[in-house]
């Protein structure tokens, strides 16, 4: 008598469940990291719009020895007219540049109604005159007589700041 042996082909149900569990674990790590990547890319748009704004502030400072109080003083359009896909406005306030950003859902919670703010402030240093340096994002302890001009209104979570801002 001849007995046929069946060879198992394909995957069993338990093996498939393990594969699905592993994919789920990988996705739970990858999706939040991808969200951080997307928001950092969106913040980068602000730095594309920034050079003419910084130039206007520096030009005003070079001519007057003071910093512009607002967009109009710096000969720039109104804050709401300087926008991009993720930048809703760029406002100058006493020399500081405040960029309002609209970002997609953040891990820390819901986005504020008005958006997140990233402040770029000029730094005055007697040794560096006539040049201006720019301080981005978080407050940094500066050694006297060096001082940052304007108020830091940054509300953007640190993880979304470009590496040169941290």
Regions found by a protein language model. Name each.
Residues 1-14:
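N-terminal leader/signal peptides at the extreme start of proteins
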Residues 36-50:
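Membrane-proximal amphipathic alpha-helices
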Residues 17-30:
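Alpha-helical hydrophobic helix detector
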Residues 46-64:
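N-terminal alpha-helical signal peptides/signal-anchor transmembrane segments
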Residues 11, 29, 41:
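Short beta-to-alpha loop/turn elements within the nucleotide-binding domains of ABC transporters
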Residues 62-166:
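Periplasmic/extracellular, small/polar-rich flexible segments of pilin-like filament-forming proteins
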């Amino acid at each position: 008598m001849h007995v046929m042996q069946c060879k198992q082909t394909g995957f069993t149900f338990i093996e498939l469940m393990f594969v699905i569990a592993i994919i789920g674990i990988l996705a739970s790590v990858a999706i939040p990291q991808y969200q951080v990547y997307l928001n950092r890319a969106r913040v980068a748009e602000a730095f594309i719009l920034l050079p003419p704004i910084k130039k206007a502030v520096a030009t005003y400072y070079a001519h007057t020895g003071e910093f512009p109080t607002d967009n109009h003083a710096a000969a720039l359009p109104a804050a709401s007219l300087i926008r991009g896909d993720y930048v809703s406005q760029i406002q100058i306030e006493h020399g500081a540049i405040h960029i309002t950003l609209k970002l997609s859902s953040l891990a820390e919670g819901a986005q504020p109604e008005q958006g997140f703010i990233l402040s770029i402030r000029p730094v005055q240093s007697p040794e560096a005159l006539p040049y201006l340096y720019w301080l981005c994002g978080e407050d940094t302890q500066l050694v006297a007589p060096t001082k940052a001009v304007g108020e830091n209104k940054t509300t953007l979570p640190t993880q979304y700041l470009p590496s040169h801002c941290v």
